[in-house]
Regions:
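CoA-thioester-processing core
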Residues: 98, 102-104, 112, 118-172, ...
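Acidic, divalent-metal-coordinating active-site segment for phosphoryl/phosphodiester hydrolysis
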Residues: 175-182
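Conserved CoA-thioester-binding segment of acyl-CoA-metabolizing enzymes
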Residues: 1-60, 100
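Glycine- (often His-adjacent) and acidic-residue-rich active-site loop
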Residues: 3, 61-97, 117, 147, ...
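C-terminal long alpha-helix characteristic of the crotonase
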Residues: 132-137, 189-235, 242-248, 264-266
Length: 266
């Protein structure tokens, strides 16, 4: 497949259908600029609409110091002081659009975190479906440390659903760092492993070998059912599963079971 042209990160797809997106500003701990936000947003939108061959995504950061240190102080923060309200809203809506693009892209997204993961970088990690990290990972939602609300880029929506309201409140009000062990204990991280890239890619490959249509449906239902009551959710799942039962992958799984072979999902 062809990715949109980007300057701030690298991207590639392997023969299993796993796309790897690597933030590539290691000298700035992969800090986010206006350009990075826009390119990432457009890439995840592209993966949703124009890349059916991509079946899973790994998001990682280059360099030894960390996954992402958040917004670049020079490129973004300093410039925001000269913007009026419409200009500020243009920026905050763009950052939110990136998180929306990650959450709503069709393939599952696996974050491979290491070192520093803070501010906007920590929100991007929270937007991924699964988060793996090295033992040296440190995460923080630093917004209150710079006089801003912890509710930024969807953090106040995402975190309570991941770690619960109480812990989300502590993280977003306190703005303090938590280490990998604590982040794993509270559910912010799924796994803590030494070789995070290998682990993340192995998991993404397993997902890529699975039923892409059903995985996309699962993502959609997890999002939808966060907004509805239990009765509505049960009915939504009934309809979703009936739709999956009409998909060729359901029959393929059954035929593979009868023939004692691995299924070949579409």
């Amino acid at each position: 497949m062809t990715f949109p042209d980007t300057k701030s990160f690298r991207s590639a797809v392997d023969d299993q259908g796993v796309a790897t997106i690597t933030l590539d500003r290691p000298d700035r701990i992969n800090a986010l600029t206006f350009e990075v936000y826009g390119e990432l947003r457009d890439t995840f939108r592209h993966l949703k609409e124009h890349a059916p061959e991509v079946r899973a995504i790994v998001l990682q950061g280059e360099g030894p110091r960390g996954f992402c240190s958040g917004g670049d102080v020079t490129d973004i923060i300093a410039q925001l002081f000269s913007r009026d309200m419409p200009g500020l809203l243009e920026f905050t809506r763009m950052t939110g659009a990136l998180v929306h693009a990650i959450r709503t892209t069709r393939p599952p997204v696996v974050a491979a975190l290491h070192g520093v993961c803070c501010g906007a970088g920590a929100v991007i990690a929270a937007a991924c479906d699964v988060r793996f990290a090295t033992p040296d990972t440190r995460m923080a939602y630093l917004f209150p440390q710079v006089g801003l609300s912890g509710a930024d880029m969807g953090a106040a929506y995402l975190l309570p659903r991941i770690v619960g309201l109480g812990r989300a409140s502590e993280l977003l009000l306190g703005g303090h760092f938590v280490d990998a062990a604590e982040a794993h204990r509270i559910g912010l991280l799924n796994r803590v492993v030494d070789d995070v890239r290998a682990e993340a890619h192995a998991f993404a490959t397993k997902l890529a070998q699975g039923p892409a249509f059903a995985h996309a449906m699962t993502k959609r239902m997890l999002e939808y059912e966060g907004h509805c009551d239990f009765t509505t959710g049960i009915e939504a799942e009934a309809q979703a599963q009936a739709i999956c039962m009409e998909h060729p992958d359901f029959l393929e799984a059954h035929e593979a079971w009868k023939e004692k072979r691995e299924p070949k999902f579409r």
